[in-house]
Amino acid sequence: MNEPRFSRLHTSLQQGFTLSPNAILKEAWQRIHGAKLPIILATLGVVGVWLVLNQLLVTISGDEEELSWEVNLLGLVISMLMAPMTAALDMIGVHRAADKTVRPNQIFDYFKFIVPLAITSMIMGLLTSLFIPLSLSVGLSPIVGMIPTMLMSIALMFTFPLIIDKGFTPLQAITTSLRLFSRQWVALFSIHIMLVLVFVVAILSFGIGFIWAIPLYMVTKGIIYRQACGIDSLDMTNSNQDPTATPPSKDHFDA
């Protein structure tokens, strides 16, 4: 991590980094202009593939109470296939944070990372699924277990981009993501609470608000990643946003 391309990430891990929730959300709002349609189409593509594959799993399993080993294997394959597409949604946000154009078919760009992403997805699923059963086992309400589950989900938000952008192994990406979260957990939690409120408004608008809420969520995550880690996998030469520069001010945006 002593290479120049890791300088921002190294600084964030050693000295911390600054996040202004209002400034980040404001910049994200600016950056979704001109990108809402491809982001929505990409999201629909991922959801569509997930629904088709899971319907296939339900069809094969039938009404059996216990899934056969063949069905379990198919479920594992589905998780492996979906991991690069899920990671692609994160990378679309990173692209917009770097002032790059995005494409709906970008969801198919990261299958070369399928092995580390699939392994990471399974580990992350295990980590985020521990708390509710644990709370039930000690007689607590499942709502109590939802709080650490949400925090763990937020803490792992850097994981997929670290694998694709930095070339980290699954364990390196997970531990690094947790360390980054510990540096700015209050700001990260606050930002996600604001995004939850945005999604609540989207639901109350009979779904129309998702046209803005989904791109805002993805681009916000991309900006946070840029601020904490820098962006190495994209050519930043012609971009006005330098990933190793100080965070943009509230009054200046490149979108």
Each language-model region and where it sits:
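Hydrophobic alpha-helical membrane segments
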Residues: 1-255
